[in-house]
Every structure is written in structure tokens, then in C-alpha cells.
């Protein structure tokens, strides 16, 4: 049975077609998998496990159903949903992974990340990321009333979008030196991440041999997801209409 990797769904109530695409994926692709890894930005925004919107509840129910059928589900934080907690992970029947997460993938030393920590050329973003990932900041934010958290999240998203419009594309992509450093630090042959919305397979010739970096796609009318088994890793294109 294969292992599947997806990221950057950015689920939100305003995009029902996207939710339907994901549910069709769960019904028609994921049941054949040993495990499903969701590598961040699963939701467009997350302000706490206590929000329990109809979308969040239905997504949890669908994932839990898949987990009960035998597929192991793993969640990793992204830059939009880093406040997902153990409560919601349990509701989904999923395991919440720390980032980065190392694993032996059918004999291949591998590392899973969301990918934003690789974008070190964007110094302003990395500074903000350090603040948002600080446990003290998160605890203080989560202690506020839900409506205040929702308002703050909307305001911060507007600010982020405005800032990103003025950034060069190269700044928002991964830094090559950071990628090489990650391979060397963890001694891996395969790096899998999302975040950049630039699905591709990148190969590097390092002293230890050829290594690969797989970038997963975001979701819209189509996506690019990862499929691994004993025969290797594939980055596969999937159109929503193909599983409607």
C-alpha cells in the first residue's frame, strides 16, 4: 500500500468546490493508502481548536472515517494553521507531527517539512514566523475570546497579502543554501515539502550522491500530490474533474 503526501489545501468555507475536491480525494484516492501526510496549510486560517466551524467539523469527521478504515493520518503545521492543536488532531483521528519530521520512506532516508522555514531570504517573514511559533505568543493569543481571534486573523491576513504583493518571487522561494544545509544536517536523500505552490522535482548532486527535493502543489482546480511505495516516489497531477 502506498503513502500519500499533500499540502496547501487552504480549506475555507468560501470555497466549497475545493472542499468537495478534497472529500473526493479522500473517497477515491486515499482509501488505498497506508498513510496520508498533510504537510501544512490544510486550512486557510486557524484561530484555535475551539472554533469548531461546520467546515472544520465535517473535515474532521471525514478524516476520522478514513483513519478508522485503516489509513494512518498525519498533520503538520503550516504558516496559516500553526495553531491546530492535539484536540483537533485527535478529532480527525490523526497524529500531529513536529516540524521537521524524519522518516524512513521505504528504505529512503527522508524529511518532511511545510517549507516556509526554507525561505530564509525573506528575513521579515522569518522574524514574524519566530514570533508566531513562540509558545508564549500562542498561549496569549489563544486565551483571547474567539471573536477577537477571528478579527485579528482577518486583519493579519490582509496585512500579509499587501506585503507579499511587493516582494520579488525569488525572495518567496526556498533559499538554495538552506536546502543544501538541510540535506547535510539530516543526512537525507529525499526532502518533501509544500508552501511555495511551485510543484516540481529538484535534483542535487552532493558529495553523498544525488538527492531529491519534492515540492507538493497547492489545491484549486487541480493539484500535485506525492505517492511513495517500494518502487519509489512519484509527483502526480490530479484534476478535480477527474474524481468528481
From Swiss-Prot:
Cofactor note: Binds 2 Mn(2+) ions per subunit in a binuclear metal center.
Localization (cell): Cell inner membrane
Biological or metabolic pathway of the protein: Glycolipid biosynthesis; lipid IV(A) biosynthesis; lipid IV(A) from (3R)-3-hydroxytetradecanoyl-[acyl-carrier-protein] and UDP-N-acetyl-alpha-D-glucosamine: step 4/6
Gene Ontology CC annotations of this record: cytoplasm; extrinsic component of plasma membrane
GO MF assignments: manganese ion binding; UDP-2,3-diacylglucosamine hydrolase activity
CDD domains tied to this protein: MPP_YbbF-LpxH
EC number(s) given by UniProt: 3.6.1.54
Enzyme type, top EC level: hydrolase
Residues involved in Mn(2+) 1 binding: 8, 10, 41, 197
Residues that coordinate or bind Mn(2+) 2: 41, 79, 114, 195
Stored Pfam families: Metallophos
Chain sites annotated for binding substrate: 79-80, 122, 160, 164, 167, 195
Cytoplasm listed as a keyword: no
An example Gene Ontology biological process: lipid A biosynthetic process
Catalytic activity: UDP-2-N,3-O-bis[(3R)-3-hydroxytetradecanoyl]-alpha-D-glucosamine + H2O = 2-N,3-O-bis[(3R)-3-hydroxytetradecanoyl]-alpha-D-glucosaminyl 1-phosphate + UMP + 2 H(+)
Keywords: Cell inner membrane, Cell membrane, Hydrolase, Lipid A biosynthesis, Lipid biosynthesis, Lipid metabolism, Manganese, Membrane, Metal-binding
Keyword Cell inner membrane attached: yes
Required cofactor(s): Mn(2+)
Record-linked InterPro entries: Calcineurin-like_PHP_ApaH, LpxH-like, Metallo-depent_PP-like, UDP-diacylglucosamine_Hdrlase
Membrane disposition: Peripheral membrane protein
Function: Hydrolyzes the pyrophosphate bond of UDP-2,3-diacylglucosamine to yield 2,3-diacylglucosamine 1-phosphate (lipid X) and UMP by catalyzing the attack of water at the alpha-P atom. Involved in the biosynthesis of lipid A, a phosphorylated glycolipid that anchors the lipopolysaccharide to the outer membrane of the cell.
Family to which the UniProt record says this protein belongs: Belongs to the LpxH family.
The name this protein goes by in its record: UDP-2,3-diacylglucosamine hydrolase
Gene name of the encoded protein: lpxH
Amino acid at each position: 500500500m502506498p503513502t500519500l503526501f499533500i499540502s496547501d489545501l487552504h480549506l475555507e468555507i468560501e470555497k466549497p468546490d475545493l472542499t468537495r475536491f478534497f472529500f473526493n480525494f479522500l473517497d477515491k484516492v486515499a482509501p488505498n493508502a497506508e498513510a496520508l501526510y498533510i504537510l501544512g496549510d490544510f486550512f486557510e486560517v486557524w484561530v484555535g481548536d475551539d472554533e469548531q466551524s461546520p467546515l472544520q467539523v465535517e473535515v474532521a469527521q471525514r478524516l476520522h472515517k478514513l483513519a478508522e478504515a485503516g489509513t494512518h493520518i498525519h498533520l503538520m503545521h503550516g504558516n496559516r494553521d500553526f495553531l491546530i492543536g492535539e484536540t483537533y488532531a485527535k478529532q480527525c483521528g490523526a497524529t500531529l507531527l513536529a516540524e521537521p519530521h524524519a522518516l524512513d520512506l521505504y528504505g529512503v532516508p527522508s524529511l518532511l517539512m511545510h517549507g516556509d522555514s526554507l525561505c530564509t531570504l525573506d528575513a521579515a517573514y522569518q522574524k514574524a514566523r519566530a514570533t508566531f511559533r513562540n509558545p508564549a505568543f500562542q498561549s496569549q493569543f489563544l486565551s483571547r475570546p474567539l471573536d477577537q481571534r477571528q478579527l485579528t486573523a482577518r486583519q493579519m491576513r490582509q496585512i500579509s497579502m499587501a506585503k507579499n504583493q511587493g516582494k520579488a518571487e525569488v525572495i518567496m522561494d526556498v533559499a538554495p543554501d538552506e536546502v543544501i544545509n538541510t540535506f547535510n544536517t539530516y543526512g537525507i536523500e529525499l526532502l518533501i515539502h509544500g508552501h511555495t505552490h511551485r510543484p516540481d522535482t529538484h535534483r542535487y548532486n552532493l558529495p553523498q550522491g544525488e538527492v531529491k527535493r519534492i515540492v507538493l502543489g497547492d489545491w484549486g482546480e487541480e493539484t500535485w500530490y506525492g505517492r511513495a511505495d517500494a518502487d519509489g516516489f512519484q509527483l502526480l497531477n490530479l484534476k478535480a474533474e477527474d474524481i468528481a
